[in-house]
Amino acid sequence: MVNVQHYLTLVAMAGAVVTNADQTYFQGDGTPYDLDKVGHGNCAFMSSWSKAVTNYVAVNQAQWDDLTHCGQCIEATCIDAKCKNRNTAVTLQVVDRCPQCQYGDLDMSPSALIKIVGSNPGRIKIGWKYVDCPEPGTIKFCLKTGSNKWWVAIQPTNTRIGVKSLSINGKAGKMLDGAYYYYIESEDVVPFNKIKVAVTSINGDVVSGTYSMKEGECVDTKQQF
């Protein structure tokens, strides 16, 4: 992993984005915001990383990419001269979108922002990158309420890294507008007691299996990327 101080130097030298050792770093404003429940973010998670309750983040509109970053983890560090804890990094899970934030900006849980700043600044300069989620447990597949035998929406959660695609009974899922679910429409009946799901990571790893699922509930794959 790149040394934090080295990272801060790189960010300061480069402006908006720095690429080093296959890592892309961004900088922008970090601001605090309250989210009462992880599932109330735009990703609408039915299950999430265990630390997301206190370590959540909303990505700016320009880097939101239509929900594709939901569930990924971000490591953020303060790069502002006013910060007391410039060598402290915090890991956060993407659960929401910040429509008014500019490119590079993040809305963060207040406790996480205080940890990297040393106080509650309101707004501060930060640097950040995408990282593997630490100790994510195993991947879960969650069946959206409202799914039926001809329209099925499934959410992959607790993934270590980002998701590239998801298929249901061999059919490529499409991203649902407004919430992090992949869905299919089928002319053939999809039995909930025997749904084949395969999820592919951004690195090409695949987790798959056949599961008995219920609306509004998640099943544990007992696997991880």
Which residues are covered by each model-predicted region?
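Mature exported/compartmentalized surface modules and terminal targeting/interaction regions
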Residues: 2-104, 111-225
